[in-house]
A protein has these predicted regions:
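Basic, flexible Lys/Arg- and Gly-enriched helix-loop patches that mediate nucleic-acid binding at interfaces
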Residues: 1-168
Length: 168
């Protein structure tokens, strides 16, 4: 959930995702990160090979986000789905679809294939959009379980684990 640091311990004393899974019975770690002000799907595992496979850019594992933005969305859409760079490095083109709009805030679905630091927020900023909320809803073929409340977790099903292992 928002307000948690995606790490196992924090020298500043902030809440960590490790506290959320302390009762799982294994030592697990996060696969990738979510920003402190982001929310949604976060995979935790004790499998180093799976972690490396999902994080390695050559595997192009999809990460899908719902992003609530303000700004000129019409102008931003072709920028977001076209060739972009972050820190001088080219990004794989994102898949972007426009969703609902309410009160000047537009919901976008953005699928990326890399996991650079604050990538979606920085892409939106480059396109002239301000992100008001960001929620990861999918990694690879595994989607956020909408029955879970923020901070809750569950083990992967055999089918979900098999889908993730395809990237090995």
């Amino acid at each position: 959930p928002r307000g948690y640091v995606t790490t196992l311990s924090d020298e500043k004393g902030r809440k960590t995702v490790a506290a959320l899974v302390s009762g799982c019975g294994k030592r697990v770690w996060p696969v990738g990160r979510l920003d402190l002000d982001s929310e949604g799907f976060l995979l935790m595992t004790d499998d180093g090979e799976l972690t490396n496979s999902l994080l390695h850019p050559s595997h192009q594992v999809e990460k899908e986000y719902l992003v609530w933005v303000t700004g000129d969305v019409e102008t931003a859409l072709p920028i977001l789905s076209g060739p972009m760079e972050l820190d001088g490095e080219p990004l794989a083109p994102a898949k972007v679809t426009r969703g609902r709009e309410s009160g000047g805030v537009t919901q976008l679905s953005i699928t990326i294939y890399q996991g650079k630091n604050r990538q979606v927020r920085r892409m939106c900023a480059q396109a002239g959009l301000e992100v008001t909320r960001l929620k990861r809803i999918r990694e690879g073929q595994v989607s956020l379980d909408r029955k879970l409340k923020p901070g809750q977790w569950r083990p992967l099903t055999a089918q979900e684990l098999a889908a993730l292992r395809k990237h090995l």
